[in-house]
Swiss-Prot record:
NCBIfam families linked to this entry: L27
Name by which UniProt lists this protein: Large ribosomal subunit protein bL27m
Organism name: Reclinomonas americana
Superkingdom of the organism of origin: Eukaryota
Ranges annotated as biased composition (Polar residues): 1-11
Annotated stretches, region: Disordered: 1-20
Keyword Lyase recorded: no
A single cellular component GO annotation: ribosome
């Protein structure tokens, strides 16, 4: 008979992969139609002129142009000029 119970395997060691969120095009960069500007959870950054908002709150370009960010007291907006 064993004098010690056999050691079980660890139940730790799992973690989810990163979601690759964040700003993809910064202010002053050139965006083509359909290019992703921001990947986010919720609307931390809100869409303004010439940008669209996807189902998963992704902000993307509706027209070609220069990406521009604007901030008021509480919110941040992104547009294409």
């Amino acid at each position: 008979m064993a004098t010690k119970k056999s050691g079980g395997s660890s139940r730790n060691g799992r973690d989810s992969k990163g979601r690759r969120l964040g700003v993809k095009l910064f202010g002053g960069e050139y965006a083509t139609i359909g290019s992703i500007i921001v990947r986010q959870r919720g609307t931390k950054i809100l869409p303004y002129k010439n940008v669209g908002l996807g189902r998963d709150h992704t902000i993307f370009a509706l027209k070609e142009g220069i990406v521009s960010y604007y901030k008021d007291k509480t919110k941040t907006y992104v547009s294409i000029v």
